[in-house]
């Protein structure tokens, strides 16, 4: 009888320990889930440092041949062409040269939001007090915007637009983007990053561009830019990120198909050959949080 009672006590003790272990495990899961949802700065900073370390220890290999060429505005360019900003006629010539070289998409991460002060009609006002006759001749010449717009019409050009928090009375915004979106899932559009206002290129330029893409990026808490929006709401419109729009134009895809839910984007499809998935918080990290599949 004594042995039987001892065994019963052992069974009860084992059961109590088992329930205690389960409660501790459940508590840890709830705490970790709360931390993940809260995402305090300390945790985010640690995650960012880990990401940077992964970039250094296992960077994406650079291919021997890349389909992307960067035309940089560097010191050599400034020494040859002159100080910034350059006349729009320079960009018109650049577009023509790139188009003739066979570029399937010519992408500018520059905002052409204001009129070119070096355009002949605009420059005429500065010469008026000096030589009215020369000023009158300059007003008869086409503007640099017209030259650039003509080049944009000839080739597939993507221009940038910025999302901002305050309206700018002197700058254009709200131009209808060429990209169309098809939404698969409820609440995806509402979950996108939002900017109340936008600043885009002049209508003469934006109206002739094959694409408009968002150039705005939001730094992390340490001030480093590691991610770029894949798409965002700018005012009442939805704009793709500049890289997404460049790929859309290059593949001649009219509609971007976005699947997901109120928690975010699950996948973004540009064409049967291009699917972009594994997005985190609607933003693509530079290396580790996106992939292209074919």
What are these regions (language model features)?
Residues 2, 11-291:
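Non-transmembrane functional regions of envelope-associated proteins
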Residues 294:
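Short, Gly/Ser/Thr-enriched beta-strand-loop segments that form substrate-interacting elements
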